A protein has these predicted regions:
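Periplasmic POTRA and POTRA-like interaction domains that precede
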Residues: 12-39
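Peptidyl-prolyl cis-trans isomerase
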Residues: 1-10, 17-20, 48-320
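Basic, Lys/Arg-rich alpha-helical nucleic-acid-recognition elements, primarily the DNA-binding modules
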Residues: 42
Length: 320
């Protein structure tokens, strides 16, 4: 990272010729704050994340997201990718719609007008467009085996508990041995003739009690290896993982619909990987700087008249 100096009014950071401004940061921050609060409530901001507050974590995410949009716009310049007139019109209409949804307090808090919002939507659209440009020829063939999705029921006997902050606390050796003994007893019951595995799940499992469909690389390695080696209807031996002891029953060794969906997911992951490699190499050489004084002065908004969270929803309504 190469640092420069000197900032314009309301300029929070610079990346080469691109600037991230206070109104842009506030639009991202307010929308993300309201989305979190609508799901988790205001108490989410009291949570400690290994010495960092949730509010600081969200601020850092906002900064990273906006900085990436700016860097991707520079990448678009490198590839001569631009918005066409229809896309610019969509950005203008999206900005008008979002601005009209705001009340006076929200406009004042975020310091926005239609011109600023139009630029934000244009830059966000261009970032997405350069992503699509770079990955347009990435269409790998994914085999059924690579994308295979299986369906299981399982019983989990945990070997940990959690503290008040949600952090895992490992069981003592004595408690782990008790958990193992319980799991072994349940396994014996599961393999008895006429045993109802689902009833044992409901009675004993300390994990999710629903049916679980998954593909390779989506769960703990020991669990995956044991499950993928089962035949339909077969019950595993005891599977030990960092989470605890599992007993797995295979319901289906090949879920056609889920496997097809997983192929789409794997292709997208490979495209993201290709883009990430080019983006990371490009971004490493960019000159950037942050206005520390202004950045430190930015905080979450505590105002009952501020509740907007539709900025990105409106974008997707216009751009898909």
């Amino acid at each position: 990272m190469v640092l420069t100096g000197g900032f314009a009014r309301n300029e929070v950071f610079k990346i080469e010729s691109m600037s991230g401004t206070l109104p842009e940061i506030m639009v991202y921050l307010v929308n993300m704050q309201e989305q979190y609060e609508s799901v988790y409530g205001k108490e989410i901001w009291q949570r400690d994340l290994n010495g960092t507050t949730m509010s600081e974590s969200v601020k850092d995410t906002v900064l990273a997201n906006l900085a990436q949009v700016k860097a991707m716009n520079l990448l678009a310049q490198k590839h001569n990718v631009t918005l066409d007139e229809m896309e610019k019109q969509f950005a203008k209409e999206a900005a008008e719609e979002y601005y009209e949804s705001l009340n006076e307090t929200e406009i004042a808090v975020m310091q926005v007008n239609e011109e600023i919002l139009t630029q934000m939507y244009e830059e966000y659209a261009l970032a997405n467009k350069v992503y699509e440009y770079i990955i347009k020829d990435i269409n790998p063939e994914i085999s059924d085996d690579e994308a295979r999705t299986i369906t299981v029921d399982y019983i989990l006997i945990k070997t940990y508990t959690t503290d008040g902050t949600g952090e895992k606390i490992e069981y003592s050796e004595e408690d782990k041995n008790e958990a193992r003994s319980l799991a072994e007893d349940i396994l014996r019951q599961a393999k008895e003739e006429g045993s109802d595995f689902k009833e044992l799940v409901l009675k004993y499992s300390e994990g999710d009690k629903g049916t679980y469909s998954f593909g390779k690389g989506e769960t703990e390695e020991a669990f995956e290896q044991a499950a993928f080696n089962l035949a339909t209807g077969e019950i595993s031996s005891l599977v030990e993982t960092p989470s605890g002891f599992y007993i797995i029953k295979c319901l289906s060794t090949f879920d056609k619909d889920q496997t097809s969906a997983n192929k789409v997911k794997i292709v997208e992951e490979k495209r993201e990987e290709v883009f990430g490699e080019e983006y990371d190499a490009f971004a490493q050489g960019l000159t950037r700087d942050i206005n520390e004084k202004l950045w430190k002065s930015i905080s979450l908004v505590d105002d009952e008249n501020v509740s907007t969270q539709q900025f990105f929803d409106i974008y997707h309504n216009y751009f898909g």
